[in-house]
């Protein structure tokens, strides 16, 4: 049998092992894995490289339409491809209007035409004003629903995203449980965080340490406990977003041990940055929940290696530079991190701390695909989409602003020495990024809808 592509001699991350083996691709799908697979129109030699499943980034903000001056599909998905991401799950906020019904998600589909370098699944929003329209987004094919129990959205803009109170969360969770949809939650106590933040600003406390102190660990833990209990009563599957503290992870672990259907994610910045570094970097490292101290970071690594965190995500949430101006308490909170999830975490987790390659593959791709029902994604296995990232280990480079593909070429990782490189990204059998050639094909990404899986 003749194939379209054979990838030879790479160390391939499979479900439960990593070994040197060849991969055959035909019609955009993985056709065979083994040795002496036969002939192909194209043969790639991956000697000395790790071949990983393409990353499934389950938490991205692209901001188009409506705020394309923050980030856009063209720049955002090119950055993703350069970083080894082949599928993103896009959040329903930062763009205008927020993705809260059929009409608003259709605007996103229109805005992205001809611009997607990678594939994209969608989340709908659960907000204070759309509980009667949740079914519309389910019918279109979103793979989950995002909500905030922390304060969010611009109150001066009618169609911006909004947080939910406990009643709205409970009613929404009941409806989404009936639809078989997971609820993803940003967990921080809104009233306490808001009051602590205002108190700090009024007293002139505006440093990174002051910001972190205004969003203490207990505000995350309390919110996680609350939504766990409400989701349990409502009968809804739950996913906790961007957990920043080991204490927060412990709440999820406890609920899981009691039989609750709950998963969680975290982000590279909680593992490789700490509050002192946040102070040095400045507003580019501001996010919520915040980047905490070194002791907290050590606890997060323990939870990650224990298998208590399901997936790693970027929470890519950029904005124009002027929104990062001024002091840390006033600046926009969001990190541009899409392009450097895989290389940074391969360096820090695999090379520096000895994480196994199969565990790395699960955290970066497989588990997210499973959680959100992306049946063709996240695994190097026969029948799956042929989506790979080639990683060159022990290959250090210093990230510069010019390396970045974002609309605004800034990141808290600029200046960092990263000990691994993404050399090639393949989407459904085609090279979409190559370290030498750049982006060799026109954008071929597609939207992934739940009912098409």
From Swiss-Prot:
Pfam families: Amidohydro_1. Homotetramer. It catalyses: (S)-allantoin + H2O = allantoate + H(+). Catalyzes the conversion of allantoin (5-ureidohydantoin) to allantoic acid by hydrolytic cleavage of the five-member hydantoin ring. The keyword Hydrolase applies. Belongs to the metallo-dependent hydrolases superfamily. Allantoinase family. It comes from Escherichia coli O9:H4 (strain HS). This is Allantoinase. Its cofactor is Zn(2+). Keywords: Hydrolase, Metal-binding, Purine metabolism, Zinc.
């Amino acid at each position: 049998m003749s194939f379209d592509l054979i990838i030879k001699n790479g160390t391939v991350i499979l479900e439960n092992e990593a070994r040197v083996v060849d991969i055959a691709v035909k019609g955009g799908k993985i056709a065979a894995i083994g040795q002496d697979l036969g002939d192909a129109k194209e043969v790639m030699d991956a000697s000395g490289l790790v071949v990983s499943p393409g990353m499934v980034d389950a938490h991205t903000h692209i901001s188009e339409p409506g705020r394309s001056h923050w980030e856009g599909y063209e720049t955002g998905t090119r950055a993703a491809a350069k970083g080894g991401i082949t599928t993103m799950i896009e959040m329903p906020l930062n763009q205008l209007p927020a993705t809260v019904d059929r009409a608003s998600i259709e605007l996103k589909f229109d805005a992205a035409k001809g611009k997607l370098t990678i594939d994209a699944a969608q989340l709908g929003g659960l907000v204070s004003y759309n509980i009667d329209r949740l079914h519309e987004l389910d019918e279109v094919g979103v793979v989950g629903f995002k909500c905030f129990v922390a304060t969010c959205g611009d109150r001066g803009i009618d169609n911006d995203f909004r947080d939910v109170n406990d009643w709205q969360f409970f009613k929404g969770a009941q409806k989404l449980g009936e639809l078989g949809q997971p609820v993803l939650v940003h967990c921080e106590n809104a009233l306490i965080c808001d009051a602590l933040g205002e108190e700090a600003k009024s007293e002139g406390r505006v440093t990174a340490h002051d910001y972190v102190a205004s969003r203490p660990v207990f505000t995350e833990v309390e919110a996680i406990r609350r939504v766990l209990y409400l989701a349990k009563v409502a009968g809804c599957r739950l996913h906790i977003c961007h957990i920043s503290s080991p204490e927060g992870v412990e709440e999820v672990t406890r609920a899981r041990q009691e039989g609750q259907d709950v998963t969680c994610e975290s982000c590279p910045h909680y593992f490789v940055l700490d509050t002192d570094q946040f102070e040095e970097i400045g507003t580019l490292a501001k996010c919520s929940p915040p980047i905490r101290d070194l002791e907290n970071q050590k606890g997060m690594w323990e939870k990650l290696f224990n298998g208590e965190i399901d997936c790693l995500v970027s929470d890519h949430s950029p904005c124009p530079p002027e929104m990062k101006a001024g002091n840390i308490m006033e600046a926009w909170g969001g990190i541009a991190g899409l392009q450097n999830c895989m290389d940074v975490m391969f360096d820090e987790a695999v090379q520096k701390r000895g994480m196994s390659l199969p565990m790395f593959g699960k955290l970066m791709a497989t588990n997210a695909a499973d959680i959100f029902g992306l049946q063709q994604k996240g695994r190097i296995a026969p029948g799956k989409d042929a989506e790979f990232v080639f990683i060159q280990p022990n290959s250090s480079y210093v990230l510069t602003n010019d390396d970045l593909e974002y609309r605004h070429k800034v990141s808290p990782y600029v200046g960092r020495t990263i000990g691994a490189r993404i050399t090639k990204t393949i989407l459904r059998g085609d090279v979409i990024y190559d370290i030498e050639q750049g982006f060799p094909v026109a954008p071929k990404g597609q939207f992934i809808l739940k009912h098409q899986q």
